[in-house]
């Protein structure tokens, strides 16, 4: 796999999702990543630290430049806990959990986040404003309601299926109510 191509495709997909999701500075963005799927394998079977590092690094760079906070979801073996910066956990008053990810318990994305973040910590759950799912890792449990599916500009990254979610406030009030314009579905 050409890692330069992977980096640029990941960047392109992320920028598309960020711009269409209407996520704002200071908000949370969740990344689910199966490096096994990116390499054309089955989720959890052929994890690649190198692939995880390439993707997480570019996602972290792009989000940081916009002031958006990254949370990287781990695999089911650590109950889909998330790694993010300690300052973000404090800002959002998130409860910390004690686990150190490994390649087969947490995954390559979490290991990469521990490498590239300044003060990484693990939390059990978040309510992110948007997210990117590379390899069908099921990020929905960590995206706030109401979730809005986004079809990325590119539906595959390597061998991995790619999906994304944005979120919007609930529409309440019924037929007599009026609503603010929807920034996601312009």
UniProtKB/Swiss-Prot annotation:
Q: Which residue ranges traverse the bilayer?
A: none
**InterPro entries of this UniProt entry?**
Antibiotic_NAT-like, DUF436
Specify the protein name: UPF0340 protein Sez_1726
Regarding protein family, the annotation reads: Belongs to the UPF0340 family.
